[in-house]
Amino acid sequence: MLMLVFRLGDNRYAIATPAIVTVLPRVNLQSLPGSSPAVAGVFRYQGQVVPVLDLNQLLRGAASSALLSTRIVLVNQGAPDEPTRLLGLLAEQATETLESHQVEEIAERVDFCQSPYLSEMLVSQQDIIQQLQIYSLLSQQAYDELIAQAATVS
């Protein structure tokens, strides 16, 4: 399986590509006043309002840097048996892919944090990569609330 690898600070993370719709350059986002700091804002993609989460803010507590390599990774966050739920993930240095045969999965999952959206840790030749579980990032209710809030500020 192919994975998109990105970096937040000194740590590397990966998203499995089957969930990725496309990778976009950073665009201007409309902010949603009163939303969580992890919500970077919303934008329109092919006529649909898409909420964007700042992964650096979510995982490290600081806003993503405006780097040339900062991208919006557009994913379908809906489970296979659910309707499509487009979600943008603001990720720094999202410029590398990795095949699953290039890494080893750590047999024992180390739970240093209680984040439901972090899953297996993978070991590459360079370092350890933490996999992101996109289906756990935002509940259906939270997603619907962001879309409703975006409609009031549009």
Language-model segments: what does each one mean?
Residues 1-154:
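An acidic, low-aromatic, low-complexity terminal/linker signal
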